[in-house]
Amino acid sequence: MRIRTRKYKALFLALATLSVGFPTIASGANPETVKLTVHYQRVAADYASWNLWLWKNKLTGTDDAVSTTGVQFTGDDAYGKIATVEITGMDKFDDLGIIVRKGEWLSKDVPDDRFITKFGADGVTEIWLRQNDPTIY
């Protein structure tokens, strides 16, 4: 019994040492620059004061806001409003957090934060969001 316990401890220590020595799969997997296009739809088409809060997210460590004032919608199409932003330094982060908010935090579109976890290999990424729907399309 004692020998078996020692073997398990040795195996655990070996695996723990190996896992600390290697970066996670997400580390460095993102492109350095992401060109993000967000399409946003509100049922009543009431877009006044709505904007995006984006941040470069680390699972461990410090996050980094993309803009301290939020990202404004600057265009529109048949779906709704469009915002386009170029985000640099994404290769040092795990994913991109996104909140659709009204004004300076008067309200949020959905209660939970959304996270963009997949980006085009060239950094070009396009998503669609709907009012009150937490899914990223």
Model features per residue range: what roles?
Residues R2-F12:
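Bacterial N-terminal signal peptides that target proteins for export
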